[in-house]
């Protein structure tokens, strides 16, 4: 009795103690440069835009326009590329005066500004006297196209304005040209890219046939361009060192197209290069009109959601978030990534954006299309291990235990594909969350059988002993190297707890009996608390072994903590203890850079496990943001804000892509920075 009274007295004091601890915790690393590399801030905020402070990268900021795989590559320096997917060509601007010429990437002064969806440059150089050129680049809103507007200001009459385009091979790159996976050089105008390029010069424009097919001996793709009035010529891809060299060279078998602009009183010039099909390649392109529409779309999207805080480094988030979220939408579903991994995988975090951004129609379309992808038969199947994968996976064949009734295939509106992830778990969580935002009884009645079949499928495959604890089979972002061999896993059990809890509420809305879902939810929560909670450590175990001594894994990843909190498994005291575990046991990596006006920024890796391997010990943006959310949910808003701020500032301002959402951070121990708008 005395012990119980003491516990009741000490518990709230301990909660306050934990909540008051600085987020630096005991795991903060010594203030040294990461990998002995000093950093300088890359971009800084200016209103809703990002202005270059220090950098000389090319092709590090993608512009999206049409909700397809097409994008325009821009960067710190004003050299551009089209990606279709596949290399669609490289575009350069140049200037000259008398015998001297250069590409503008070599200009004396370049001011670079990224406003979500649009890149702007101001070019100053000794060749231009006291004048300058202003460039604005967009991706077309209605077609797969590159749009460039150039405005001149006080440019001497003797200055020449030149342009060059070429190198459209149609070749896809390893990871579609993404940061950290493919080198910048894949977008350079490499002479070999120009092989089999066939140009047809027209008045103020051209068409280009490219993407050679050796079997049919024909080109498979077409670009159509409208360019400013002026001289138009073909040159050699071997002679592109500067505009003067290009003009003096002899045409060979690796052609490029170049021109010199007839500078006019209008002092404004447009380029429009579109990826077209045979029946659209002869249409008249209205460059100014296309530019206006693209600018309107980019601006509308960037202003869909606005932040107004005392920190200008966070006020840009609304525009970048909406732009990146729009980039992963390709009707009828959200994709895995905007650049790399631009493919259908139904359960990564992207679809959660839809309701937050007011795209309830997109959310509904996404969920419907994957509801159509649910396997309906057989009712169940045998467990068949894949011998080609060292028996680590189930054989990817429909009709086996995993790929039976209730399984949801990776492609929308197709239920005939087996794949090695349990994408059901997170997808259903997103679907259930949709109904927290939307009172949609008609859709609920339509989709509820999908939820029912999913819950039965999860139970049948991952809680085979009916103890309320579920195995994890490649079910979350970090799952690639996580293996539990049929064990009882905290985070998947937490997902199933929330799923059954919300299914009970939705069943009641439909007039169905919710009791079975309530009973399963209670069983799961009790099992997690009784078998997976570690009272001495104040955290949940990662999992419990299924065999042998049924040992507990007592060093959980941060996903175990934040998923348990997000799914409302722990009580208030347990939340604080579990968050304290992250402070105490997970390393904290200082974020340092010259010119960064923030102090005490730091990130966390996903685990303290060794040795490093992919997906097990990463410094990942989304994982840090999910942990920040858990800190807010767990009653430590100051720490949550600090981690939230740290992750976003590091990604959007220190990272390679201005306003970009990386997958992995510069601080990842082995891979370093990886991907953008992921």
Q: What are the residue ranges of the model-derived segments?
A:
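Bacterial Sec-dependent N-terminal signal peptides
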Residues: 1-29, 150
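Active-site cavity-forming subdomains of large catalytic enzyme subunits
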Residues: 431, 454-458
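Catalytic cores of carbohydrate-active enzymes
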Residues: 315, 380-384, 463-478, 485-491, ...
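Terminal accessory carbohydrate-recognition/targeting modules of carbohydrate-active enzymes
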Residues: 24-316, 345-346, 356-362, 636, ...
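Substrate-binding groove/exosite segments of carbohydrate-active enzymes
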Residues: 180, 245-252, 258, 296-445, ...
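Amphipathic, well-ordered alpha-helical segments in soluble domains
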Residues: 89-93, 117-119, 366, 423-430, ...
């Amino acid at each position: 009795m005395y012990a119980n009274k003491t516990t009741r007295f000490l518990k709230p004091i301990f909660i306050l103690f934990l909540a008051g601890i600085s987020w630096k915790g005991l795991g903060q690393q010594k203030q040294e440069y990461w990998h002995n590399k000093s950093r300088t801030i890359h971009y800084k905020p200016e209103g809703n835009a990002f202005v270059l402070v220090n950098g000389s990268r090319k092709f590090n900021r993608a512009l999206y326009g049409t909700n397809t795989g097409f994008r325009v590559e821009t960067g710190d320096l004003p050299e551009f590329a089209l990606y279709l997917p596949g290399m669609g060509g490289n575009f350069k601007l140049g200037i000259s005066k008398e015998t001297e010429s250069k590409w503008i990437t070599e200009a004396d002064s370049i001011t670079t500004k990224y406003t979500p969806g649009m890149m702007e440059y101001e070019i100053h150089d000794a060749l231009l006297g006291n004048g300058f050129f202003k460039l604005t680049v967009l991706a077309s809103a209605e077609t797969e196209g590159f749009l460039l507007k150039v405005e001149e200001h006080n440019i001497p009459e003797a200055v020449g304005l030149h342009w060059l385009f070429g190198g459209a091979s149609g070749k896809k790159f390893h990871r579609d040209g993404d940061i950290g996976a493919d080198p910048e050089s894949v977008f350079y105008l490499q002479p070999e890219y120009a092989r089999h390029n066939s140009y047809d010069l027209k008045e103020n424009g051209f068409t280009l046939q490219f993407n050679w097919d050796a079997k049919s001996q024909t080109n498979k793709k077409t670009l159509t361009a409208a360019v400013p009035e002026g001289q138009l010529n073909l040159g050699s891809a071997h002679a592109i060192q500067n505009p003067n060299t290009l003009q003096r060279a002899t045409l060979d078998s690796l052609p490029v197209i170049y021109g010199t602009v007839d500078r006019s009183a209008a002092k404004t010039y447009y380029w429009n290069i579109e990826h077209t099909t045979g029946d659209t390649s002869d249409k008249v392109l209205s460059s100014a009109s296309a530019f206006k529409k693209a600018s309107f779309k980019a601006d509308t999207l960037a202003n869909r959601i606005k932040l107004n805080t005392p920190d200008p480094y966070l006020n840009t988030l609304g525009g970048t978030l909406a732009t990146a979220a729009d980039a992963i939408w390709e009707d009828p579903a959200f994709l895995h990534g905007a650049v790399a991994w631009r493919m259908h995988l139904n359960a990564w975090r992207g679809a959660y954006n839809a309701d937050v951004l007011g795209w309830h129609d997109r959310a509904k379309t996404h969920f419907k299309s994957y509801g159509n992808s649910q396997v309906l038969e057989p009712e169940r199947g045998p467990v068949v291990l894949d011998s080609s994968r060292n028996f680590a996976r189930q054989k990817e064949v429909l009709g086996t235990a995993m790929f039976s009734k209730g399984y949801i295939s990776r492609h929308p509106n197709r239920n005939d594909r087996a794949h090695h992830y349990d994408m059901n778990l997170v997808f259903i969580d997103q679907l259930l969350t949709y109904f927290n935002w939307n009172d949609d009884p008609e859709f609920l009645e339509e989709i509820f059988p999908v939820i029912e079949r999913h819950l039965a499928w999860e139970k049948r495959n991952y809680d085979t002993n009916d103890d309320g604890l579920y195995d994890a089979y490649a079910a979350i972002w970090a799952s690639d190297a996580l293996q539990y061999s049929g064990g009882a896993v905290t985070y998947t059990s937490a997902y199933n707890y929330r799923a059954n809890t919300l299914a009970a509420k939705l069943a009641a809305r439909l007039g169905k009996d919710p009791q079975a879902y309530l009973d399963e939810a209670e069983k799961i929560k009790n099992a997690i608390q009784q078998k997976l909670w570690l009272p001495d450590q104040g955290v949940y175990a990662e999992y419990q072994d299924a065999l042998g001594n049924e040992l507990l894994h007592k060093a959980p990843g941060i996903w175990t903590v934040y998923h348990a909190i997000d799914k409302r498994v722990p009580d208030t005291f347990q939340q604080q203890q579990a968050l304290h575990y992250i402070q105490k046991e997970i390393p904290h990596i200082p974020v340092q850079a010259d010119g960064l006006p923030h102090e005490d920024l730091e990130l966390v890796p996903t685990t303290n496990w060794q040795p490093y391997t992919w997906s097990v010990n990463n410094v990942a943006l989304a994982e840090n943001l999910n942990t920040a959310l858990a800190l807010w949910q767990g009653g430590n808003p100051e720490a949550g804000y600090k981690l939230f701020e740290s992750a976003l500032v590091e990604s959007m301002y220190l990272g390679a892509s201005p306003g970009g959402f990386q997958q992995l951070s510069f601080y990842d121990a082995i891979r370093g920075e990886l991907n953008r708008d992921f």
